[in-house]
């Protein structure tokens, strides 16, 4: 990707820029759009070339099973994160929010509590409420300008009606890259309260200074209650 070549996306039906005025009353010519995780750079040439190849086929029918796709994911996770993924364990959804909704609907019932470490990506609460589940806010503490988790306080909040916990790792919007010890504490929290753990790791390739650890590597003992979600969208701006 060429980070020295920003693209002017005004009047291209870009939600990031063309929706600034109607949503927030801010002239995009005068403001800086920071309300959505969407980069103003072209994706890698390999991505563009692959899309062009598919478009040039001229027929856009239903897409079938693609082993190369799963193998590419496995290779990336192995090279970048040291995680050996079983391709049979990969389930494709129409985006991370859709994947979250499917998890909520599959593993919980109406009225159940779903734990969020807040503040966090706003779509999680929307998905939970839309499914007639309850948002259980476990508030992150601020310590020297960074968010931290207080599991003594969170344990005291639980009443047994909670069935799921959603973690954002790395954290959105705080930017925290959780340590291995913190991830282990989240896993132990899920075990103590018999919760399905959904780990949103969509920003796993975009960290600065700290190293991201995939939850299955940090706490392999909870893989039977873990759903890890990620995507190529943030990494490659697609």
Where would I find each of the regions flagged by the language model?
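Walker B catalytic acidic pair
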Residues: 201
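N-terminal small-domain helix-loop-helix segment of the aminotransferase-like
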Residues: 2-95, 102
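Conserved core of the PLP fold type I
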Residues: 60-188, 205-220, 227
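Active-site PLP attachment segment
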Residues: 218-238
């Amino acid at each position: 990707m060429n980070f020295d070549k920003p693209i002017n996306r005004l009047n291209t039906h870009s939600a990031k820029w063309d929706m600034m005025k109607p949503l927030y009353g801010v002239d995009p010519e005068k403001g800086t759009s920071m309300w959505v995780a969407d980069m103003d750079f072209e994706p890698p040439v390999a991505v563009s070339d692959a899309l062009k190849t598919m478009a040039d086929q001229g027929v856009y029918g239903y897409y079938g099973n693609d082993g190369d796709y799963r193998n590419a994911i496995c290779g990336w996770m192995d090279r970048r994160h040291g995680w050996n993924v079983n391709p049979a364990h990969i389930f494709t959804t129409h985006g991370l929010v859709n994947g979250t909704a499917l998890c909520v609907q599959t593993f919980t019932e109406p009225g159940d509590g779903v734990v969020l470490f807040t503040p966090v990506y706003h779509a999680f609460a929307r998905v939970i409420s839309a499914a007639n589940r309850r948002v259980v806010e476990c508030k992150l503490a601020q310590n020297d300008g960074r968010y931290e988790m207080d599991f003594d306080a969170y344990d005291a909040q639980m009443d047994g009606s909670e069935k799921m916990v959603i973690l954002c790792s790395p954290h959105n919007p705080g930017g925290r890259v959780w340590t291995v010890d913190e991830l282990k504490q989240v896993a132990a929290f899920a075990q103590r309260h018999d919760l399905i753990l959904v780990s949103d790791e969509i920003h796993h390739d975009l960290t600065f200074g700290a190293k991201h650890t995939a939850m299955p590597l940090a706490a392999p003992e909870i893989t039977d209650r873990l759903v890890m979600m990620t995507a190529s969208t943030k990494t490659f701006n697609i």
